[in-house]
């Protein structure tokens, strides 16, 4: 087929096949329907809205508290080798794939796969399960940050001294620890830091285990309610509100990170901290765990396999050059992670010098960095209240825009399933309120005295790297080997005016699936049951619950395949051929061969087959 004819077919395909189903415009009101206006899917008011929304969605807490620690732990500068291999081999290709599918189909994270390849629409359901679980526990971090922010508005920070009601007789302030002769004469194991006691005894009121949940922490419950209310009002009007809020939430954290970077680099001991952060240890690359950490960090930091990037892309205009901006956003994301390491480790180097200990003794990851190491560092600086307020505002904004972008992706995907019902009147807003309320109630289990154990269980299993790798593999497999990488490239050319370099197509077909399979297998081989603080061992029932959370998303893909095959009549070969082919208004081919479509939503099954030119379907024709 000539190139012009091919492109014209693609234009017709997008117009007639992949166009949004009726009633999919956020904010469509009864008066619009009364005027007979055909509802159109809302689009970003400008490309800056999309760019800042994506930047806010994946530049989050993981860039600040996870990447620097992984870099130090896994060989310093040597860690960048597997990191960049996974970045160009899987991170950027999958990120762009999700955005461009959303833009091409104008659909959310579930219905886009129903139009591209109905048999594998379970990919969308798996993504929604993951992001729904993620939204429940990720926002708890913001509740902790909010609590710390409120506590920072004091002349003396409450975690700087041992004279509070929650402190124990074993609490020792750092001024005493610095007195080496006094410290050596005592047993270090018998004493704790005021910042640790504030975290464990005041903020968490930590119980003895997950089977002792204890009472609800009302102060944290109110903080959690506050951040959920902020999240709701940021997204309740769809992209009209989200696209404007990110002008502040996605840019201000970068300014504060720059301020913290400059401050950290001017502290004594900063040079040693940065050396510790980047000094390469090539021998660490022999450890498979280093490669697993690199792969999972890429998937976490790019917010892929969650349906959020697909939903954000679905609001792009059809001719928008998303390839260019996706590449620039990828550079921004990874660059932020790298620069954050300088800000964090310069301060950790200062801490180590002030305490007279090795940097390895103060280096933390995750909540340990945000709520123990850094709060401890600000107590050693001039103007500790100012730096504490600045840090927790930055932390709150970094997490908040990631949270509401992920919730927006979740809502868009679910609303697109039932547009004729949820797009009427104010039903979308009511639905968002219901989803946020349910997520808040589930999150209350994590702000009890045993809530930290529940939080760690969700973090370790519910949105684990294994789940994301599983989804990414099937996304690439479907596009490269069923829909056809060349077919998608034709669509991309029609949208942006040119074909991207072939490395994307090769990554979808070979490189990304290979990296996902390798990382997936090694993750299972190297699996270690969850512990808290390397001391508390979770009971067997909790480990089983954790695996249940992980499998709840992974099982969606094979489960949907089985359900669709069972609900479609005809010979198995014909059913498969019918279900792996994109839909078209004019029925032909398969139905003449005796396959009868299953009875699902009319928007999916009112069409039949587009003549395929991709690998697996061609072998079955």
UniProtKB/Swiss-Prot annotation:
Entry keyword set: Cell membrane, Glycoprotein, Membrane, Neurotransmitter transport, Phosphoprotein, Symport, Transmembrane, Transmembrane helix, Transport
Cellular component, GO, one term: GABA-ergic synapse
Compartment annotation: Cell membrane
GO molecular function: alanine transmembrane transporter activity; amino acid transmembrane transporter activity; amino acid:sodium symporter activity; beta-alanine transmembrane transporter activity; gamma-aminobutyric acid transmembrane transporter activity; gamma-aminobutyric acid:sodium:chloride symporter activity; taurine binding; taurine transmembrane transporter activity
Region ranges (Disordered): 1-42
Glycosylated residues, chain numbering: 163, 179, 190, 281
Similarity-based family: Belongs to the sodium:neurotransmitter symporter (SNF) (TC 2.A.22) family. SLC6A6 subfamily.
Name by which UniProt lists this protein: Sodium- and chloride-dependent taurine transporter
Source organism of this protein record: Rattus norvegicus (Rat)
Lineage: Eukaryota, Metazoa, Chordata, Craniata, Vertebrata
